[in-house]
Each structure stands twice: as structure tokens, then as C-alpha cells.
Amino acid sequence: MGRKWNNIKEKKASKDANTSRIYAKFGREIYVAAKQGEPDPELNQNLKFVLERAKTYNVPKAIIERAIEKAKGGSEENYDELRYEGFGPNGAMVIVDALTNNVNRTAADVRSTFGKNGGNMGVSGSVAYMFDPTAVIGFEGKTADETLELLMEADIDVRDILEEDDAVIVYAEPDQFHAVQEALQNAGITEFTVAELTMLAQNDVALPEDARAQFEKLIDALEDLEDVQQVYHNVDLGA
């Protein structure tokens, strides 16, 4: 799973480089989570998860509070959660998750972006079956063995625990996200380098240099779309 962590690192690095964009996306995601449930994260697991993710991207408190207050204020702005699947150069697989208040606009934007960058949209299910929904939690201050021991003591099973670049990365089932994080917090871990619910490719692929350059342009263009929240793919960008 080391290569999978490479992809997450590359993704975080690219997003960290464009803070205004990522803050805007988090503001929307926090608003939607708070509006769909309680505005209190202790009573709303979806909101709690989004806030934990936001911490790893250093989203300012003011943006978080503004989004929650907007939801509390009874804003009538509604968003649909959408998933698109498609292919990039050399048949590389791509999943795009979006939050939108205009489904037709978003579908057209995503389709156009695929087409302009050597890819094409697929039908629902054409790609997702090659990915596994996965909770990924990364932190420093423990070894993989110590992490395994404390999770076993908490009676939590996970898929894998790896040490990568001075950090420990835990891969778990999505419904174990909060249990894993709480067990780690109880063991003294307070800062997380990554806290994601992601779609991990079952098999990564390497692309030739020219195709890889075009693929990276496709991913960047998709992530630049206002309505797109997450982009997942099966290309090893850490090679």
C-alpha cells in the first residue's frame, strides 16, 4: 500500500499549494454536512469527519464557523452529491465526487474537462468496482507495532498499518474511521497528517512519461472545477 500513500501525499501537496480553493471546497462541504444533520459535530458524524479532515489542511476557524452558522441560519441553498466515473490517457481510471447546486452545469463541466485532456466519461459503475472505499489515518509519534498493539487493545481490526516517511499510516474500513481515531487520541495522538475517507485503487498503474504528463493535467483540471470535491485515480504518481 506504500504507493497508495504516495498518491495521497501528492494530492495533499497539490491541494496545500492552492489554499483559497481548498478552503472554499471545505466551506461548502462543512455547510452541507451541518445542514443535513445537527450543526454540533458530536451529534453529527458526517460533520465530525469533515472537520477532522479540515484540520489536516489547516482550514481557518473563521471559515469553519461561517459555514456552520450559514447552515444554522436556515439557508435555502441546496447541494446534490454526485459521482462521475471516467478514463484518462491509456485507460487510466478516474472517479470524481462533486457537490453542486446545478447538476447540468457540473455534468457538462466534468465531461468537457475529460474530453479536453485526453479522457472520456464512463457510465456509472465502469470504474468504481476497481476501487475500495477506505479510511486512511496518518500520524507521527508511534511505530507501526505500537499502533497495532493499541488498536488490538481497543478491539479494532484494520486492513493494514505501514510506516512511511516518519509517519504511521493506518488503512481501515470506512465505518472504523472514528473508532480508529478515538483509540489513537486516547493513546495521546492529537495531530493527524492525514484523515481521509478515500477510494483506493485495487491496482495502481504506471504511465509512460507523455501520457503521465497529460494525465496530471487532467487531474489538475478536474480538481480546479468549482463543484468538484474529490478526485480519485489508479495512477502511481509517486514513482
Curated annotation (Swiss-Prot):
Its main location: cytoplasm. Keywords: Cytoplasm, DNA-binding, Transcription, Transcription regulation. One of its GO terms (biological process) is regulation of DNA-templated transcription. Transmembrane segments: none annotated. Pfam families: TACO1_YebC_N, Transcrip_reg. It is found in: Cytoplasm. InterPro entries: Integrase-like_N, TACO1_YebC-like_2nd/3rd_dom, TACO1_YebC_N, Transcrip_reg_TACO1-like, Transcrip_reg_TACO1-like_dom3, Transcrip_reg_TACO1_YeeN, YebC-like. GO terms for cellular component: cytosol. The keyword Coiled coil does not apply. One of its GO terms (molecular function) is DNA binding. It comes from the Bacteria. Belongs to the TACO1 family. YeeN subfamily. This is Probable transcriptional regulatory protein BLi00754/BL02339.
